[in-house]
From Swiss-Prot:
PANTHER family: CYSTEINE DESULFURASE, CYSTEINE DESULFURASE 1, CHLOROPLASTIC
Keyword terms of this UniProt record: Pyridoxal phosphate
Organism in which the protein naturally occurs: Haemophilus influenzae (strain ATCC 51907 / DSM 11121 / KW20 / Rd)
Recorded family membership: Belongs to the class-V pyridoxal-phosphate-dependent aminotransferase family. Csd subfamily.
Protein name: Putative csd-like protein HI_1343
Residue numbers bearing the N6-(pyridoxal phosphate)lysine modification: K146
Length: 238
């Protein structure tokens, strides 16, 4: 796994413009899967892939949401094929608080396609302890401010094999290893994705937050949140 610190606060969704098929019409018969019902979906996610599909000629396959706000797994399976390039999933809704069974969904995607999997963990990152290796997503993204950090930092983590497919979006210092009049050699991952002077103050502040979070009991915090939700249900007779 590698972690890239980016200056985009919308959870590093600009990876859509770093994928090699971002503007190639040869993917006109391929698809990108995403979830429906804007109440459940993060707008930054959906809009990003909608625009990408228009540029590269791909089709967006929208996954329906059941009455319990979970993705319809049967439709997910029927949507997947060898032409599915990527599936973008929301871990937790920023409106309903619904937590998708993200690990099971990824397992289904692996079983029925070769698609890349991108997880929006913005709303989950401060409430759920996430094991990246166990989750098996190709990409996972969130903003630092979603986990008590400073504004202005987008975090993109992923498998080395997946990140290696990304092409730099911005260009500048730090991202290069060697420069000559005729050739530029980009630095290794993740540095090739971190062009220009970084948000130094933000990174230092976020590092302090991460040190503090090492002492955080995510399991206890998650159980407390569940307890509060159950209490609300009882009081409002849901």
């Amino acid at each position: 796994m590698r972690v890239a610190i980016l200056r985009i606060t919308e959870r590093s969704w600009e990876i859509n413009t770093m994928l090699p098929w971002k503007s190639s019409k040869k993917f006109s018969n391929h698809s990108i899967a995403s979830t429906s019902k804007w109440l459940v979906h993060q707008v930054a996610n959906f809009v990003t892939w909608h625009e990408t599909a228009k540029k590269c000629g791909a089709k967006i396959r929208v996954l329906p949401i059941l009455d319990n706000w979970l993705i319809d797994e049967n439709v997910l399976i029927s949507t997947l094929s060898e032409k599915t390039k990527l599936v973008a999933l929301n871990f937790v809704s920023n409106v309903t608080g619904t937590e998708q069974p993200i690990k099971r969904l990824i397992q289904l995607i692996r079983k029925h396609s070769h698609a890349l999997v991108l997880v929006d963990a913005a709303q989950a990152i401060s409430h759920i302890k996430i094991d990246l290796q166990d989750l098996d997503a190709d990409f996972l993204a969130f903003s630092a401010h979603k986990i008590y950090g400073p504004n202005g930092l987008g975090v993109l983590t992923g498998k080395l094999t997946a990140l290696s497919q990304l092409q730099p979006l911005f260009f500048g210092g730090k991202m290069v290893e060697r420069v000559s009049n005729n050739r530029i050699t980009f630095a290794e991952l993740p540095y090739r994705l971190e062009a220009g002077t970084p948000n130094i103050a933000g990174v230092i502040g976020f590092n302090a937050v991460l040190d503090w979070l090492q002492k955080w009991d995510f399991t206890a915090a998650e159980q407390h949140a569940i307890s509060l939700a159950e209490s609300v249900k009882v009081r409002r007779n849901f």
